[in-house]
């Protein structure tokens, strides 16, 4: 989904976050890892080409990487793309050595809170990701709302000290509409 031509949800969050961080901190070298067979589109995730962003593709089918991660906890992605800190914009199969501080963003836990709204296939997928194991491995968790933080504490027993709430910013295209604007009718 991150290499999809139509960008929404987590890919949009990721692109906007990296764009903002790379702009705010030009002294930091931002290394972006992605995998799969697809070619990265020219303006992937709406990231402008910045001299402090470098790309680290792993040309391998994601299903193969996911299978190896699930069965063998390999490949250790932080060995492939070393960094001072790993930022995971969403939980997925992410085999890491545990030697690099890691921050994980959790957008919601609806699949745990209301599993009846998910197909058996989606429930299996979420269960296979072993989210509790990943949460134990990471150093910090960003929750995008107080509700997500509460769900993390209630459903997965995550200590509140490990969670920071950072709300997602509004899309810059969003602008207030004047009361006289005919679109309000």
Q: What is the predicted function of each stretch?
A:
Residues 1-185:
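Carbohydrate transferase catalytic cores enriched for Leloir-type hexosyltransferases
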């Amino acid at each position: 989904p991150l290499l999809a031509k139509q960008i929404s949800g987590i890919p949009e969050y990721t692109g906007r976050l990296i764009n903002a961080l790379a702009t705010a901190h030009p002294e930091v070298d931002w290394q972006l890892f992605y995998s799969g067979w697809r070619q990265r589109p020219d303006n992937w995730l709406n990231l402008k080409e910045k001299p402090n962003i470098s790309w680290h593709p792993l040309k391998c089918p994601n299903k193969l990487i996911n299978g190896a991660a699930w069965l063998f906890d390999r490949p250790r992605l932080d060995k492939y793309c070393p960094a001072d800190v790993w930022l995971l914009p969403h939980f997925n199969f992410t085999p890491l050595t545990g030697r690099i501080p890691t921050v994980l963003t959790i957008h919601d836990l609806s699949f745990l809170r209301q599993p009846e709204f998910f197909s058996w296939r989606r429930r299996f997928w979420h269960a296979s990701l072993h989210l509790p194991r990943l949460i134990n491995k990471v150093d910090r968790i960003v929750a995008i709302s107080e509700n997500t933080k509460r769900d993390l504490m209630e459903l997965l027993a995550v200590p509140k000290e490990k969670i920071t709430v950072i709300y997602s910013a509004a899309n810059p295209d969003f602008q207030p509409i004047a009361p006289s604007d005919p679109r309000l009718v």
